[in-house]
Amino acid sequence: IAFRIYVSIGMARMKKVPSLSFKDALEYTTKGNKEALITVGIIKDGKAEYRVYGENGKEVEDRLCTYEIGSITKTITALMVKRAEKEGKLELDDTLDKYLSLPDGKKYPKIIDLLTHTSGYKPYYFESPMIENFFKGRNDFYGINGEMIVDRVGKVNLDKESYSFNYSNFGFAVLGVVLENVYGESWKKLADDFLLNEMGLKNTHVSDESGDLGNYWDWRDDDAYLSAGSVTSNICDMLKYAEFYLKNDELYRECQESVKTI
């Protein structure tokens, strides 16, 4: 009961945020929180800048914080999928059984369905490591590896010809496993190499819990859900990442093109 009350209060408070001004939203979300550190970046007229805010939305001394960027990780995974397509390693209209060892005689979604969250998959599926993770206060997805993901894909029954949008962390975990199979490398290694050597983002990588803020999610190097939300970065790299899309580079431009109507 207490948990439900806590969630209800939290949801009620969050509903207020969209109607607030930028300044009011900052003050509201940092009210009375002495540990609050929110970094806001702006790109205007080709110039990027940022400011850091603390308790009660007050601007504080400039510092570069390492944040968990959460599901922005998915956009990086999507870029890696697009790169794999350009290299001829996969096709977006291929179904998963072309890249994963799965039971015959079943219907599997296409790569493009996973990218657009129209695969029919749930946000996630229960796996046994989640029990221990709950009691140890860990990241829910800690210890769920690629083998478990492939096994789950083989068990899920998808009987419709098409599915409507349903946000799926599981779907992006599957994409990570597909990338591992087509490249023969772990998603962590692929992502870290892509971020550093192809994108030049020196402070963006799969989380190793080494940032300055603490309380980062714990991950194993072979966790399948890394590709759904494990990357950490700072505001300078994130502004640079945003500029890649604004500058109309070929890879980023193609990733913004419409691929499916949902």
Where is each model-derived feature located?
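Hydrophobic membrane-insertion alpha-helices, especially the h-region
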Residues: 1-4
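Ser/Thr/Pro/Gly-rich low-complexity linker/stalk segments immediately outside membranes or between
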Residues: 7-21
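Short, conserved catalytic-motif segment at the N-terminal edge
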Residues: 19-69, 89-91, 154, 216-218
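Residue-level preference for non-acidic, small/hydrophobic
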Residues: 26, 40, 46, 74-77, ...
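Short active-site loop at a secondary-structure junction
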Residues: 32-37, 58-114, 158-170, 226-229
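Short, surface-exposed loop or secondary-structure junction motifs
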Residues: 107-262
